[in-house]
């Protein structure tokens, strides 16, 4: 069934395929355009550099008038990410407008890697380390980057087994 939300998501998908912003990728599940898997590559010159962080985006029929539910599936140590992977980002809450699309959502999340907002912490420990003990913060982030690589290797091994 074609609805305004589904048509808009197909346009978002076309844009992601044709002109994906650097360091982000996303696509809907093969059997459900309302649920997307996404990945953000940690930006250069940040502690997250080269990490591969997976996310899940869940849309409902009110999209684009209502933001999707977005959460990290990958482990994330960041001042604005809750332990369950949910993200504290104004455009996913009170500053949402229908002009945002999947690409702009992901680039906004990616920008948090460069510029965390410790004034609005979802993870108090990460915010405190970011503000007061930067070297410890960087060490913890780099541990999650390495974990993201390990998770990717496990996923690739699982895919290889599925193909056999």
UniProtKB/Swiss-Prot annotation:
Organism this protein belongs to: Kluyveromyces lactis (strain ATCC 8585 / CBS 2359 / DSM 70799 / NBRC 1267 / NRRL Y-1140 / WM37) (Yeast)
Query: Could you say which enzyme class this protein belongs to?
Result: transferase
Pfam families reported for this sequence: UQ_con
Where does the record place the UBC core domain? Answer: 4-150
User: Which residues does the entry assign to the active site, renumbered to this chain?
Assistant: 88
Q: Where in the cell is it found?
A: Cytoplasm; Nucleus
- Which Gene Ontology BP terms does the record give? chromatin organization; DNA repair; protein ubiquitination; sporulation resulting in formation of a cellular spore
Q: What is its EC number?
A: 2.3.2.23
**Its function?**
Catalyzes the covalent attachment of ubiquitin to other proteins. Plays a role in transcription regulation by catalyzing the monoubiquitination of histone H2B to form H2BK123ub1. H2BK123ub1 gives a specific tag for epigenetic transcriptional activation and is also a prerequisite for H3K4me and H3K79me formation. Also involved in postreplication repair of UV-damaged DNA, in N-end rule-dependent protein degradation and in sporulation.
Name listed for the protein in its UniProt record? Ubiquitin-conjugating enzyme E2 2
Catalyzed reactions per annotation:
S-ubiquitinyl-[E1 ubiquitin-activating enzyme]-L-cysteine + [E2 ubiquitin-conjugating enzyme]-L-cysteine = [E1 ubiquitin-activating enzyme]-L-cysteine + S-ubiquitinyl-[E2 ubiquitin-conjugating enzyme]-L-cysteine
Q: Could you tell me which SUPFAM superfamilies the record lists for this protein? A: UBC-like
């Amino acid at each position: 069934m074609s609805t305004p939300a589904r048509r808009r998501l197909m346009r978002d998908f076309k844009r992601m395929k044709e002109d994906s912003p650097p360091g982000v990728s996303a696509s809907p599940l093969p059997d459900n355009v309302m649920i997307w898997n996404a990945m953000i590559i940690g930006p250069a010159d940040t502690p997250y550099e080269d990490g591969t962080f997976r996310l899940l985006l869940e849309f409902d029929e009110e999209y684009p008038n209502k933001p999707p539910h977005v959460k990290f599936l990958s482990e994330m140590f960041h001042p604005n990410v809750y332990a369950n992977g949910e993200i504290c980002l104004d455009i996913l809450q009170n500053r949402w407008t229908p002009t945002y699309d999947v690409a702009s959502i992901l680039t906004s999340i990616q920008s948090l890697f460069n510029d965390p907002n410790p004034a609005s912490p979802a993870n108090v420990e990460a915010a405190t380390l970011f503000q007061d003990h930067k070297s410890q913060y960087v060490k913890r982030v780099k541990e999650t980057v390495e974990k993201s690589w390990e998770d990717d290797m496990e996923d690739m091994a699982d895919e290889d087994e599925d193909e056999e």
